[in-house]
Each structure stands twice: as C-alpha cells, then as structure tokens.
C-alpha cells in the first residue's frame, strides 16, 4: 500500500503540471506565454525526481543519501533501477533535457504537441519506476 501512495504523490505533481499548462494561452498549436509552460515543465520534472526518490527510499536508501544532483541520479539509476529496465537511464536523460533544461531552465518549449508528449513520457517513466 505504501508504494501506491509514493507513486500517487509523483502523479499528483504531474497533474499539477497539467493544471498549470491549462492556464497557458495557445495560438496555432503554440503556447504564447512561456511562464506557465516553464512552471509546468519544472513541476513535471519534479514528478520524475519524486518517483525515483520514493523508489530509492522503498529500496532502503536513507533520505539523507538521496541524490542531490542530476549526476547523482545518473549514478543511482544503474545501481537500483536498471536491473529492472535497462532503458531507464536513457529515458531519464531525455526527460532531464526536455523538461528541466529546454522546458524549465531555458524556456525553449512552446509547441503544444512537444510539451504534451513530454508530460506523457514523464508519466510513462513514473509508471515504470513504481
């Protein structure tokens, strides 16, 4: 039952990201206000991190030992999650680049389809991590 709530928390973050996106105006399949898109991408990336953190806690990692950087996550994924799915590190890197770097940090994502597909990819990743 505990694992359900852990995944539920990550999915709650993802739903928050979708709610933020719904506030962004769209014209010709393009978001015309970058601020809510950046916020949504940042929140979706946090959902991915939350899912990984909760999985690691479930596997016995102490909270103080959780990764503190993207490189830390890249080190933890092969040790604890790659056993179950070898493509998770590649998927994590894609989500990091799309959601965190391009979407949140740089504010480069404006295409509605690309943003929505990125959030779908985040959900698929979260489901794999549980």
Locations of regions flagged by a protein language model:
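Terminal alpha-helical segments
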Residues: 1-130
């Amino acid at each position: 039952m505990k694992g359900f709530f852990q995944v539920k928390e990550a999915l709650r973050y993802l739903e928050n990201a979708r709610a933020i996106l719904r506030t962004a105006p769209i014209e010709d399949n393009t978001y015309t206000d970058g601020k809510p898109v950046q916020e949504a991408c940042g929140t979706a990336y946090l959902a991915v991190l939350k899912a990984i953190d909760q999985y690691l806690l479930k596997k016995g990692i102490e909270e103080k030992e959780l990764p503190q950087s993207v490189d830390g996550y890249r080190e933890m994924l092969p040790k604890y999650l790659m056993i179950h799915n070898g493509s998770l590190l590649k998927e994590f890197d894609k989500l990091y680049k799309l959601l965190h770097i391009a979407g949140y940090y740089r504010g480069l994502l404006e295409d509605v389809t690309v943003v929505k597909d990125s959030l779908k990819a985040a959900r698929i990743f979260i489901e794999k991590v549980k």
